[in-house]
Amino acid sequence: MSGLLHTTLSGLNSDSYCEISRYRDQHFRGSKKLQEKFLKISSTLYVGNLSFYTTEEQIQELFSKCGDVKRIVMGLDKIKKTPCGFCFVEYYTRADAEHAMRFINGTRLDDRIVRTDWDAGFKEGRQYGRGKTGGQVRDEYRTDYDVGRGGFGKIIQMQKANQQPAVY
């Protein structure tokens, strides 16, 4: 096996992809030690940086490649009850969740880089996002037209291109 390929595969199989992050749920009832214990045995993942248009079916299709998904809970805007850029994916086993952490974290879905992290387990009410609108805080300040992000986006640009008369 070539050196670069071996290094890449060794990295994917290392436990570093499955380590728990420093983030802790502020609403967790219990000590930090107890929360860390739950994170180490959890089969639930927090999935962030999703497009507001990503569907539960897309999440199911992607994450089921790593194992049997028990349930998916889409993050919702508190007021509008519309998707707001995150979800929870619960597997039947920790091993399947570890596969997802290794192979899905950092992949692209709907032109966004998906971020996964361990979660101590979904509890009712956590599907509602944080921030003033209930979405992911970083998305609250975005506008429909954002020069730094390519203007109106690929979909609008394609629609405009299709409306242009053909020149012969």
Swiss-Prot record:
UniProt keyword list: Cytoplasm, mRNA processing, mRNA splicing, mRNA transport, Nonsense-mediated mRNA decay, Nucleus, RNA-binding, RNA-mediated gene silencing, Translation regulation, Transport
Entry's localization field: Nucleus; Cytoplasm
Record: residues binding mRNA: 23, 46, 115-119, 126-130, 136-137
Superkingdom as given in the UniProt entry: Eukaryota
Entries under PROSITE patterns matching the protein: RRM (PS50102)
Transmembrane region(s): none
Gene Ontology terms: biological process: mRNA cis splicing, via spliceosome; mRNA splicing, via spliceosome; mRNA transport; nuclear-transcribed mRNA catabolic process, nonsense-mediated decay; regulation of translation; regulatory ncRNA-mediated gene silencing
Keyword field contains Membrane: no
Gene Ontology CC: one annotated term: cytoplasm
Molecular-function GO terms, alphabetical: mRNA binding; RNA 7-methylguanosine cap binding; RNA cap binding; snRNA binding
Family according to the record: Belongs to the RRM NCBP2 family.
Function: Component of the cap-binding complex (CBC), which binds co-transcriptionally to the 5' cap of pre-mRNAs and is involved in various processes such as pre-mRNA splicing, translation regulation, nonsense-mediated mRNA decay, RNA-mediated gene silencing (RNAi) by microRNAs (miRNAs) and mRNA export. The CBC complex is involved in mRNA export from the nucleus, leading to the recruitment of the mRNA export machinery to the 5' end of mRNA and to mRNA export in a 5' to 3' direction through the nuclear pore.
The name this protein goes by in its record: Nuclear cap-binding protein subunit 2
